[in-house]
Amino acid sequence: MAIVTLDEMLEAGVHFGHQSRRWNPKMSQYIFTERNGIHIIDLVQTAQLLAEAYDFLRISAEEGKKVLFIGTKRQAANIIAQEATRCGAFYINQRWLGGTLTNWTTIQSRVEYLKELEMREESGALDLLPKKEAAILRRQLEKLRKSLGGIQTMRHIPDIVVIVDQKRENNAVQECKKLNIPIIALLDTNSDPDVVDIPIPGNDDAIRSIKLIIGKLADAILEGSHTKTSSAE
C-alpha cells in the first residue's frame, strides 16, 4: 500500500512550490511545471522519496536509532513538537542554538541546568528565594524549556535528523554534515537538495502539507519501534 496518495497530497497543497523567480535551479528535477508564476512540484517523485524516507526511518527505529526533528518556522513549530512527541523522537522547534550538535557537551550542560531549575521549581525551592531572584530564574527556565525542552532526554547526538525547510535550517544542516548525520528534509523549490540525504520535495510553508509529510515520517518511527518491541518480547 502507498505511504501517501496523490489525492492526499493535492488536498494538502504539497504540490505548491514558491514563485518561480525564487527557485533554486537544483530543484528543477522535482518541478513538474509552472503555473501563474508558481512552480508546481512533481508529486510522483514526492511520493517515491517519502516512501524511501519512510522505509529508512522504519528500519532505523527497529534498530533502536534515535531521531531528531527540526522545524523552527511558525507553521512547523507545533507540528514538529506534536509528531516528535507522538513517535518518541526528540525535537527542536524554536531557535536553533549554534553548536547544538557540534558542541554537544556544552549543550548538555545547559540541559542539566534546565533539569536542575525544574527540580527547584517542582520542590518549591524557587518560592523561598527573594522575588527578584526567583523571577530571573523562572525567566531562564522558560527560555531553556523553549530552546531545549525537546532534547531534554537526549543522551547523545541523534542518529538521524528530519528537517522542515532546508534553507531556513541551513545551520543545523551544516552541523549534521560535519558529523555525518543522515538528513531527511521536506524542502521547497527554493532549497538545495544536494545537501540532504533524502530530499522530499514539497510545500514547506503550508501547515497541512507539513502535517501530512511529518506525520507519515512519525508513523514510520512508530512502526519500527513497535516491531522492535515485539521482537524483544
Swiss-Prot record:
Chief localisation class: plastid
GO biological process, alphabetically ordered: translation
PANTHER family found in the cross-reference section: 30S RIBOSOMAL PROTEIN S2 PROKARYOTIC AND ORGANELLAR, SMALL RIBOSOMAL SUBUNIT PROTEIN US2M
Pfam families: Ribosomal_S2
GO-annotated cellular components: cyanelle; cytosolic small ribosomal subunit
Any GO MF annotation of the entry: structural constituent of ribosome
Similarity field: Belongs to the universal ribosomal protein uS2 family.
Gene3D superfamilies per the UniProt record, alphabetical: Glucose-6-phosphate isomerase like protein, domain 1, Helix hairpin bin
Keywords: Cyanelle, Plastid, Ribonucleoprotein, Ribosomal protein
HAMAP family documented for this protein: Ribosomal_uS2_B
Name this protein carries in UniProt: Small ribosomal subunit protein uS2c
Cross-referenced InterPro entries: Ribosomal_uS2, Ribosomal_uS2_bac/mit/plastid, Ribosomal_uS2_CS, Ribosomal_uS2_flav_dom_sf
Subcellular location: Plastid, Cyanelle
